Amino acid sequence: THHRSSAASDVYKRQSLPFLEAIRQYRHDHGRENSLFVHLTLIVETTEMKTKPTQHSVGKLREIGIQPDILICRTSNSLSDHLRRKISLFTNVQEDAVVDGLDVESVYEAPLMFQQQGLDNTIANYLKMWTRRPMLQPWIELVNRLKNPKDAVDIAFVGKYVQQRDSYESLNEALMH
């Protein structure tokens, strides 16, 4: 039986170190062909996209023995080919495994966004798995229904941090159903 795992982590938090060590040991015990390290990283955007924080976080992971296989780069705009090559070069992650993690209206759009970038094929190839072409039409229809509802319902909730939308993101997502 093969075990497969993926991990994304904030390398700056000390409380995450035991988990990072656990995934490092998992890969050691089960091999590269049975594990996949996915690092979610923020591309800081000011007047231009900054890649230094991503390079730094990958460097910190490497210091503890973890080399990410895939980078999901959180950004509001797609990475240019030049930036993707630069990130690939300085993080030692294959260029096709440097993926945009763009802002989406609904979390349900994320799998479609990643599939459009070929992330499913990248994962399957890395793990040497055969997969058939995904049948995404039901998922696409679900996303379309969520984005274009036929009816509306007003729901109000009281909270301390209602001005900060992210504070209640999980509740907002749950209420969409």
Tell what function each PLM region has:
Residues 13-19, 166-169:
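Glycine/threonine-rich flexible loop motifs
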Residues 10, 44-45, 77, 161-163:
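Short histidine/acidic/glycine/proline-rich micro-motifs that form metal-
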Residues 35-130, 143-146:
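Internal gly/pro-rich beta-alpha loop/helix module
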Residues 20-24, 50, 135-141:
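Conserved alpha/beta core surface patches that mediate binding of polyanionic ligands
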